[in-house]
Amino acid sequence: LTQKLKLTGSVLVSTPQDIALIDVVRGLKMFEKTNVPIYGIIENMSYFVAPDTGKEYQLYGESKTEAIAEKYDYELLAKIPHDPLLMEQCEKGHPLTDLFPEHKVSQMFIEMAEDILKKIKLNKLSETT
């Protein structure tokens, strides 16, 4: 599919589990081989924040996503927490960023989107020069 379409770029999304990160590495290698720009990696369901204490819990053990990003020289764009409000709004088909723009996770998504757009613009500029 990547050979038939002219892709603007890619963002790889993974959970912190080792098995999921194997797929990320495969994806990185495939996009590199097909010359599709890689704008970064996102770790989804990275941790859970206890609402009563604010303490972070690693649901899947110690993450290796950061090490993978460093090894292959790509930015880790964000570590998105396992958030009940995000899950609830996704199930309803409502973007969290629209309904709760000040929520911490909404802010993470907004910052990621802005960062990715900047990278796309820089990539487009470098293609024209």
Protein language model regions, located:
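Residue-level detector of alpha-helical recognition elements and their boundaries
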Residues: 25, 39, 101, 124-127
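C-terminal boundary of histidine-terminating zinc-finger modules
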Residues: 92-105
